[in-house]
């Protein structure tokens, strides 16, 4: 299996399976002399960690991260990067592979069982193996390192829709996001989602969600035309997340309903004499290059395919059969996708920052003369 690495200069390679001994990643291309602490990485992982509420899988994984290489202890505390590959390891401790014994030969509808088998002629049926969302913990660890490449930049995510219930954007409050199990920025939507997901969970079913990401403080100029577009790389990174089925940047598909007057972001000079956009329909990216405005992206996640309802399928011998999935699963995988989406955005931004610096050096001076 190839394609376990993403990025150009800031490169992340992940390894491991859901029920293997461990999962991990190697971060290559990270600049030297960046300070961070193990607690920085652990805090990011804890936001994604399973089993923290009744609305996520009850698999109990502490997700304790170990740094194996690429750092030295800093005299003032914490660690400092050396510029060599940074290896991060997370041991798996709560696997229950016996839950999957009955489906070893049959394909679960909606999962990657059939496609892995038809491509490789073999698959790891234990919790989905390499295709499991368990792998995303490694991306979160890598994202915590990527964040150190971009001081002054913030990346935040929130769930904005679960099933048919969407937040009221007039009540958006980032301070509310860590105060509920849904990463929800609208406090009045929280009880609605609680009631809704309780019903979904008790029925043994699942539901999809939409996650919104906002990056602020991103320097103008990151990204490159035509095949190195920042939004294209961001979309690719987000679609690489398990269960992701769609991505929007800025207005996204809604832009198809707008007129040119409505969609184009007008510009004036701000208080510091630099261009300022009066709106942000573009989502902070024009021509594949960051404008300096907040970068706004959304990605949609399908319902978890592991449900208790019996489903029709076929097995490896070509026989029709019926299947239902045991094990522990998220009733809404979109909830824990928030820190994963943030991490992928961090990695893409760090990569483009290093690529931009390598090509043009410091940011181009503005205004232009003559």
UniProtKB/Swiss-Prot annotation:
Its EC number is 4.2.3.5. It catalyses: 5-O-(1-carboxyvinyl)-3-phosphoshikimate = chorismate + phosphate. Gene3D superfamilies: Chorismate synthase AroC. The keyword Amino-acid biosynthesis applies. HAMAP family: Chorismate_synth (MF_00300). It comes from the Bacteria. Its cofactor is FMNH2. NADP(+) binds at residues 48, 54. SUPFAM superfamilies: Chorismate synthase, AroC. FMN binds at residues 130-132, 242-243, 287, 302-306, 328. It holds the Pfam family Chorismate_synt. Belongs to the chorismate synthase family. The lineage of its organism: Bacteria, Pseudomonadati, Pseudomonadota, Alphaproteobacteria, Hyphomicrobiales. InterPro entries: Chorismate_synth, Chorismate_synth_AroC_sf, Chorismate_synthase_CS. Keywords: Amino-acid biosynthesis, Aromatic amino acid biosynthesis, FAD, Flavoprotein, FMN, Lyase, NADP. GO terms for biological process: amino acid biosynthetic process; aromatic amino acid family biosynthetic process; chorismate biosynthetic process. One of its GO terms (molecular function) is chorismate synthase activity. It comes from Xanthobacter autotrophicus (strain ATCC BAA-1158 / Py2). Reduced FMN (FMNH(2)). Homotetramer. This reaction introduces a second double bond into the aromatic ring system. One of its GO terms (cellular component) is cytosol. This is Chorismate synthase. Pathway: Metabolic intermediate biosynthesis; chorismate biosynthesis; chorismate from D-erythrose 4-phosphate and phosphoenolpyruvate: step 7/7.
């Amino acid at each position: 299996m190839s394609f376990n690495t993403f990025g150009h200069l800031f490169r992340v390679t992940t390894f491991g399976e859901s029920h293997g001994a461990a999962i991990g990643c190697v971060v290559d291309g990270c600049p030297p002399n960046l300070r961070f602490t193990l607690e920085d990485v652990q805090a990011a992982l804890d936001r994604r960690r399973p089993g923290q509420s009744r609305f996520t899988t009850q698999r109990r994984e502490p997700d304790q991260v170990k740094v194996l290489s690429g750092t030295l202890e800093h005299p003032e505390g914490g660690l400092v990067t050396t510029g060599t590959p940074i290896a991060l390891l997370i041991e798996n401790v709560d696997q229950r592979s016996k839950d999957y014994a009955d489906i070893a030969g049959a394909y679960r509808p909606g999962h990657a069982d059939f496609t892995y088998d038809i491509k490789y002629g073999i698959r790891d049926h234990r919790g989905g193996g390499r295709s499991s969302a368990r792998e995303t913990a490694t991306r979160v660890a890598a994202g915590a390192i990527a964040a150190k490449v971009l001081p002054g930049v913030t990346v935040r995510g929130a769930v904005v829709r679960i099933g048919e219930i969407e937040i009221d954007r007039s009540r958006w409050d980032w301070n509310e996001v860590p105060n509920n199990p849904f990463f929800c920025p609208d406090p009045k939507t929280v009880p609605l989602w609680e009631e809704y997901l309780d019903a979904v969970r008790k029925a043994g079913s699942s539901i999809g969600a939409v996650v919104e990401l906002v990056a602020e403080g991103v320097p103008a100029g990151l990204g490159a035309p035509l095949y190195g577009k920042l939004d294209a790389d961001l979309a690719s990174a987000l679609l690489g997340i398990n269960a992701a089925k769609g991505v929007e940047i800025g207005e996204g598909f809604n832009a198809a309903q707008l007129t040119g007057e409505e969609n184009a972001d007008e510009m004036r000079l701000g208080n510091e004499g630099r261009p300022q956009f009066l709106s942000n329909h573009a989502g902070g990216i024009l021509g594949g290059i960051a404008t300096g405005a907040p970068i706004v992206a959304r990605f949609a996640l399908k319902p978890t395919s592991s449900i208790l309802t019996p489903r029709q399928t076929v097995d490896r011998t070509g026989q029709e059969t019926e299947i239902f999935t045991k094990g522990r699963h998220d009733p809404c995988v979109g909830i824990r996708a928030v820190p994963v989406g943030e991490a992928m955005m961090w990695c893409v931004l760090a990569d483009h920052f290093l690529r931009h610096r390598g090509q043009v050096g410091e940011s181009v001076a503005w205004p232009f003369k003559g």
